[in-house]
Amino acid sequence: MVINMKGDFINYCGLLGIVAFLSYTAAVVFSPLAYPGYNWMAQAVSDLSAANAPSLRLWNQLSCLYNVSTLVCAMMVCAGIQGKGSRILRLGIYLFTAMEWVSAVGFSMFPLSDSGYAGTFQDQMHIFSTIIVVLLSIISLVLIIIAGIKDKEYRLYGAFAGIALGMM
């Protein structure tokens, strides 16, 4: 029996997407407990990780695996899709990975300075990062949906991309 180490490694690293999901979900669910008066219907999730948020420490602890796991997972998907799939599918995946990098770097470098929007340069860069992340998310997911519509081999990718886009 021969084990494909490269393929197995890529597949196992792909499972870090689940770790990222659980880490981010824990941060979103439990960080409000450390933020008196936080209203999830009226406030952005970014308020939980603002530079002066009372929940910042808990947010950082719970989300510590999110960025690294997301980036490794996305990069492994890029490595695994090379030379495979349609051009539209690959472009969608590459743009989604670019979005993950912009998210990881942009939001780490420029957390909100204060809950809400204080209008500082840091806040402006946070908003700019958000705009880029949202645009890349929409474009990449639409491309993956199109790939799923055009080729039934990628229909499941398209369906999950549609669900993700709908949840946005």
Regions found by a protein language model. Give the residues of each.
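Short, Lys/Arg-rich, polar N-terminal cytosolic tail immediately upstream
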Residues: 1-12
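Interfacial segments of alpha-helical transmembrane regions
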Residues: 10-17, 85-98, 154-163
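Alpha-helical transmembrane segments of multi-pass membrane proteins
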Residues: 21-39
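Internal transmembrane alpha-helix with an interfacial aromatic "cap," most often the third helix
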Residues: 65-92, 139-149
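Membrane-proximal helix-loop-helix units in multi-pass membrane proteins
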Residues: 103-146
